[in-house]
UniProtKB/Swiss-Prot annotation:
It comes from Gloeobacter violaceus (strain ATCC 29082 / PCC 7421). Pathway: One-carbon metabolism; tetrahydrofolate interconversion. The lineage of its organism: Bacteria, Bacillati, Cyanobacteriota, Cyanophyceae, Gloeobacterales. One of its GO terms (molecular function) is methylenetetrahydrofolate dehydrogenase (NADP+) activity. Pfam families: THF_DHG_CYH (PF00763), THF_DHG_CYH_C (PF02882). This is Bifunctional protein FolD. SUPFAM superfamilies: Aminoacid dehydrogenase-like, N-terminal domain (SSF53223), NAD(P)-binding Rossmann-fold domains (SSF51735). Belongs to the tetrahydrofolate dehydrogenase/cyclohydrolase family.
Length: 290
């Protein structure tokens, strides 16, 4: 058996095409496009690529990203908080995202909590996370929302199924577990202290892997016919010195066991950016229409 490939890049392209039409219609109706401000502090090279992709994708669908800013690493926490306050008050800015990680002298928790919940398009403000816990509408974390959209578009049944999540971060593991619960899955969350991980993953009808460890999950850990969602993205170097991107799943072996699997790249990553754009449009509509 060879798994069906869940192509997140193709799905993201389709959703972004739909967003482009929606943004054009909204701009004609309200006289301005949705506005997104991505704040990047410092010179982390990985962050540079992520920020560039977010701004480029935003522009492509018609979102105004002119108020995105690259800030010096020496910027103080007080200065960053003051900037967020100004963006919170700016009626042309519908979404604010602070690119992580931040320099060590800045408390990321205080910074993320300063963003107005209605402009928190990364879905990390306590208010939005609380709404998720309560099952209420709100801006959802981008990567978990992307995972759920992939599962939905693929027609993967969740009600009554066993879903195992590897990882418990506030960025992915915890919110995706809550979203799976919302769809009536029986959810098991595992992490670095979990005993006999393989015994648990072999129970999964749906396995979501967000461990941050290259190729952690092998074919022996996967139940035949399971759906595997690989959230990880890691750059590794082989014995010849060649660099390549891999996920947290050993794709080549697991694809022979699973019913469906997301690749790395072209899997969850493109959907994360797309959900950011969708959240920005959602915030815009909530503020101007509702």
């Amino acid at each position: 058996m060879s798994a069906a490939i869940l192509d997140g890049k193709a799905l993201a392209a389709r959703i972004q095409a739909e967003l482009t039409c929606e943004v054009q219609s909204l701009q004609e109706r309200f006289g301005r496009p949705p506005g997104l401000s991505v704040l990047w502090v410092g010179d982390n090279p990985a962050s540079a690529a992520y920020v560039r992709n977010k701004n480029k994708s935003g522009q492509a669908v018609g979102i105004d990203v002119a108020k995105s800013q690259h800030l010096k690493a020496s910027l103080s926490e007080t200065q960053l908080l003051a900037l967020i306050d100004r963006l919170n008050a700016d009626v042309t800015v519908d979404g604010i995202l602070v690119q992580l990680p931040l320099p060590e002298h800045i408390d990321s928790g205080r910074v993320l909590n300063r963003i107005a919940p209605e402009k928190d398009v990364d879905g990390l403000h306590p208010v939005n996370l609380g709404r998720l816990v309560r099952g209420e509408p709100g801006l959802r974390s981008c990567t978990p929302a992307g995972v759920m959209r992939i599962l939905s578009e693929a027609g993967v049944p969740l009600a009554g199924k066993t879903a195992v999540v590897i990882g418990r971060s506030i960025l992915v593991g915890k919110p995706v577990a809550l979203m799976l619960l919302e769809k009536d899955a029986t959810v098991i969350t595992t992490h670095s202290r979990t005993a006999d991980l393989a015994a648990i993953t072999q129970m999964a009808d749906v396995l979501v892997v967000a461990a941050g460890r290259p190729e952690l999950v092998t074919a022996a850990m996967v139940r035949p016919g399971a759906v595997v969602i690989d959230v990880g993205i890691n750059r590794v170097t082989d014995y010849e010195g060649n660099s390549r991107l891999v996920g947290d799943v050993d794709f080549d072996s697991v694809r022979d066991v699973a019913a469906a699997i997301t690749p790395v790249p072209r899997g969850v990553g493109p959907m994360t950016v797309t959900m950011l754009l969708a959240n920005t449009v959602q915030s815009y509509k909530q503020r101007l229409i509702e």
